[in-house]
C-alpha cells in the first residue's frame, strides 16, 4: 500500500467540511484520501482493508493508515472537524466517556462506532522458551508497582509463586498510550488485584488509590515499554528465551513459527477461545468514523464498506488473526457501517 502524508490542509470551515472540500481556501488544500490513525493492534487489519480497498476502487487514492496508539489516535480524531484531522480512529478498546466529551467540545459531535471484531491480549515466549500457566493474580503480583498496596520485592517468577521458574521477571509490553495497555489493566491487572477483597472494597472507598495499587506498573526494568511496535516485542522475546511479551493475538498468530502463547487460567489464546470469551484476555476492536467527513472525503464511505466486507469468519482479516464478532454484534456493526448510526455516548465509561 502506498502511504501518502499531507501537511497542508484547508482551515476549518464554519459552515461544514463539505464547503472546504469544494475549493480550498486560505491557500490550503483538501485531502483526496481517507486518513485513519490509532491502535497498533488494529493497524495490520486497517492496512489490509486499505490495500483491498485500492484494488476494488482504483479511482480512489490510497488511504493513509497510521499506527499512533489508541489514546493518541483518538486524541487526534477528537481535535476537530476539517481536512487536517483524521476521518477514522482505530481503537483496541472502546472510546472513553472523557474522550467522547473532548470530541463533543471540539465540534466532533457526529461519530459512528463500529466493532470490527475481537482480539485477545496474548502473553507469549520464544519457541522452546519459558513456559508457565499464568493467571491474572500472578501477572498482577509480578508487574504491579505496589502489589496489594505493598512494596514490590519480586525479582524472579519464583518469588511470585514457588511453582514458577526461578527466572528473572522480564516482560516486554505496550506503552501507557496503547489500547492494549488499557486492556491489560482492565482485563488482567485489575482482575488480579481484586482477588484481594480489601482491594476490591478500595474501589468504593478510595478510587484513586485503587487505581494506583491495581493498575500502576513497576518501573524497575522488569516491565519494558516497547512503544507502539508489537513486532519489536516479538523480536525481543525471540532473542531471549526467558522473556515474555504482551501483544495482540494477531501478532501471536502471525508469528507462531517463532513464539508460543502462554495459557491464562489454563486457557490458551486461540481463535476459538477468544471468540467464545473463554480466554480472559479477549476484547473487542473498534473503528470510530467522523460522520462530518462522509460527504467531504472521497472514498470514506467505501473504505468503511470494505471493512464490513472483510471481517467475516474465513474472510481476509481472519486470515491475519482477526477474530470475528458474535453474529448479533456483527449484524449491528454491518448496519452501523452502512447507516452511520450516531454514537450517543451514554454507555461509555
Question: Where on the chain are the PLM-derived regions?
Answer:
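C-terminal motif of bacterial Sec signal peptides marking the signal peptidase cleavage site
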Residues: 16-19
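Flexible loop/hinge segments at secondary-structure junctions
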Residues: 21-349
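Bacterial N-terminal signal peptides that target proteins for export
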Residues: 1-9
Amino acid at each position: 500500500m502506498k502511504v501518502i502524508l499531507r501537511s497542508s490542509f484547508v482551515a476549518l470551515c464554519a459552515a461544514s467540511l463539505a464547503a472546504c472540500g469544494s475549493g480550498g481556501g486560505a491557500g490550503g488544500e483538501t485531502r483526496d484520501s481517507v486518513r485513519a490513525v490509532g491502535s497498533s493492534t488494529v493497524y495490520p487489519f486497517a492496512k489490509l482493508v486499505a490495500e483491498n480497498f485500492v484494488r476494488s476502487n482504483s479511482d480512489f487514492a490510497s488511504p493513509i493508515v497510521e499506527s499512533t496508539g489508541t489514546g493518541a489516535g483518538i486524541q487526534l480524531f477528537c481535535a476537530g472537524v476539517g481536512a487536517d484531522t483524521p476521518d477514522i480512529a482505530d481503537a483496541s478498546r472502546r472510546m472513553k466517556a472523557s474522550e467522547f466529551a473532548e470530541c463533543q467540545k471540539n465540534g466532533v459531535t457526529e461519530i459512528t462506532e463500529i466493532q470490527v471484531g475481537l482480539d485477545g491480549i496474548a502473553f507469549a515466549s520464544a519457541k522452546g522458551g519459558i513456559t508457565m500457566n499464568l493467571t491474572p493474580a500472578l501477572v498482577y503480583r509480578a508487574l504491579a508497582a505496589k502489589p496489594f498496596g505493598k512494596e514490590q520485592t519480586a525479582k524472579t517468577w519464583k518469588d511470585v509463586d514457588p511453582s514458577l521458574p526461578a527466572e528473572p521477571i522480564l516482560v516486554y509490553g505496550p506503552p501507557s498510550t496503547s489500547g492494549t495497555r488499557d486492556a491489560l489493566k482492565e482485563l488482567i491487572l485489575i482482575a488480579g488485584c481484586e482477588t484481594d477483597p480489601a482491594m476490591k472494597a478500595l474501589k468504593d472507598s478510595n478510587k484513586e488509590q485503587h487505581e494506583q495499587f491495581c493498575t500502576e506498573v513497576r518501573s524497575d526494568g522488569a516491565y519494558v515499554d516497547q512503544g507502539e511496535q508489537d513486532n519489536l516485542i516479538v523480536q525481543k522475546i525471540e532473542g531471549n528465551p526467558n522473556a515474555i511479551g504482551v501483544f495482540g493475538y494477531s501478532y501471536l498468530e502471525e508469528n507462531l513459527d517463532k513464539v508460543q502463547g502462554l495459557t491464562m487460567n489454563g486457557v490458551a489464546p486461540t481463535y476459538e477461545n477468544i471468540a467464545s470469551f473463554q480466554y480472559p484476555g479477549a476484547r473487542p476492536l473498534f473503528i470510530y468514523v467522523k460522520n462530518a467527513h462522509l460527504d467531504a472525503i472521497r472514498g470514506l464511505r467505501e473504505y468503511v464498506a470494505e471493512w464490513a466486507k472483510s471481517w467475516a469468519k474465513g474472510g481476509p482479516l481472519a486470515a491475519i488473526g482477526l477474530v470475528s464478532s458474535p453474529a448479533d454484534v456483527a449484524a449491528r456493526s454491518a448496519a452501523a457501517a452502512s447507516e452511520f448510526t450516531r454514537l450517543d455516548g451514554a454507555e461509555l465509561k
